[in-house]
Amino acid sequence: MQPPASAGLFRSPENLPWPYNYMDYLVAGFLVLTAGILLRPWLWLRLRNSKTKDGDEEEDNEEKKKGMIPNGSLGWPVIGETLNFIACGYSSRPVTFMDKRKSLYGKVFKTNIIGTPIIISTDAEVNKVVLQNHGNTFVPAYPKSITELLGENSILSINGPHQKRLHTLIGAFLRSPHLKDRITRDIEASVVLTLASWAQLPLVHVQDEIKKMTFEILVKVLMSTSPGEDMNILKLEFEEFIKGLICIPIKFPGTRLYKSLKAKERLIKMVKKVVEERQVAMTTTSPANDVVDVLLRDGGDSEKQSQPSDFVSGKIVEMMIPGEETMPTAMTLAVKFLSDNPVALAKLVEENMEMKRRKLELGEEYKWTDYMSLSFTQNVINETLRMANIINGVWRKALKDVEIKGYLIPKGWCVLASFISVHMDEDIYDNPYQFDPWRWDRINGSANSSICFTPFGGGQRLCPGLELSKLEISIFLHHLVTRYSWTAEEDEIVSFPTVKMKRRLPIRVATVDDSASPISLEDH
């Protein structure tokens, strides 16, 4: 938990965790190290003097500028401070890299990651400006492997009216009453079936099992494909495809990128078959059932007009990416945090059992609003997202010199708006490393604002499916704590290269009846 986001269905792909496969970059870094040493004088001078040009004219321009490039260190030639960045990612507190430099240089500082001079912001107000000034001032910045794999016209790369139109279309569909009623039932069915299978297993690895469930739900929303052989093949091809998101950008046969591109071809072929079948049977008299329907019915995209099936198939594949890591990780960490906090779990059980008894007495089915009305459950979700930091930030490239709060971000430089630094800031959140769902009842206005809590990103690329993501987690938690008890084995969170559990969170699950307490935890 930057694409990427921001934790969920249709989390903006731009909020993908970075880097996704750090070993490729370590190898690349050491391969170019020798060349870097030979070119050290030239590289070092270039990086150190990137904020100026030669001659008296540049000196005059600098006098006119009010802002200054933030202080900081560019580290070693070529590799910069990459090794420190990675080392902190493996620690129990990955934000240490940011905190150390914040104490030395302030909340906004410069550094060098993988030979690229960047500016890192741990300031919520600066992050807000970066997120909101999208398209005309900042554009997404990605490793070359991502652009090679997804193409120049992917959801990640498009800007302006095209991006805004797609975002609006998907957002409107995900908020539609028609979808809310249907998807609530679909998620319930998938969750109930998945949890029932857990009770039959001697040991459940939560991270793996939830990933299967959330992928099925995501594909159901995207293209109405039900579980079965086609779904299994689709998932296998998708897993092969996303392995190439962050890798050495070489396309020779046998390389990671080459294999992923081939998997993408097979994946798009499978999706295209569904899209073409839908085109033949398409009708506009009934509400859209999934995202395929939404995109096929939209007539406002010039690119789509020539090859609608190719356009829609490509976009569907791209929309699968955010759900692969964010939703499963959020649910898994919710189980982890609750397992370590029996008091919070007891309160969660109490709230959800009360709603379950009320619905049984009334003989009513659950609705979207029922799940979202569970206030403490929403507190648990917010606290999980704050601490998990599945999307630790977003990367942007400045299209021109930009001044924010006295800091100058030069044209062509990348800026990392760090979400994790804000979420773990002691000046905003008391005891930020403590799992405390009750903080959301007493939290001050500044911490609860959109600039201080950004698990779904922000600005024009705010995750359009954030409400749906919270619904899915709410349904999962409700049925877990009202139907089952579990004992969790010892496990720890790994924050690099992506957030995950070291042992995939093994638990033992047992069923409970309404009169029994679902709480059954090992001592921690």
Swiss-Prot record:
Provide the gene name from the record: CYP90C1
Q: Name one GO cellular component term.
A: endoplasmic reticulum membrane
Pathway assignment reads:
Plant hormone biosynthesis; brassinosteroid biosynthesis
Q: Which Pfam families match?
A: p450
The record's subcellular location field reads: Endoplasmic reticulum membrane
Its EC top class is oxidoreductase
Q: What is this protein called?
A: 3-epi-6-deoxocathasterone 23-monooxygenase CYP90C1
Q: What happens when the gene is disrupted?
A: Plants with short petioles and round leaves. Altered polar elongation of leaf cells. The double mutant plants cyp90c1 and cyp90d1 exhibit a characteristic brassinosteroid-deficient dwarf phenotype.
Taxonomic classification? Eukaryota, Viridiplantae, Streptophyta, Embryophyta, Tracheophyta
InterPro entries per the UniProt record, alphabetical? Cyt_P450, Cyt_P450_CS, Cyt_P450_E_grp-IV, Cyt_P450_sf
* Species of provenance: Arabidopsis thaliana
Biological role stated in the UniProt entry: Involved in brassinosteroid (BR) biosynthesis. Converts typhasterol (TY) to cathasterone (CS) and 6-deoxotyphasterol (6-deoxoTY) to 6-deoxocathasterone (6-deoxoCT).
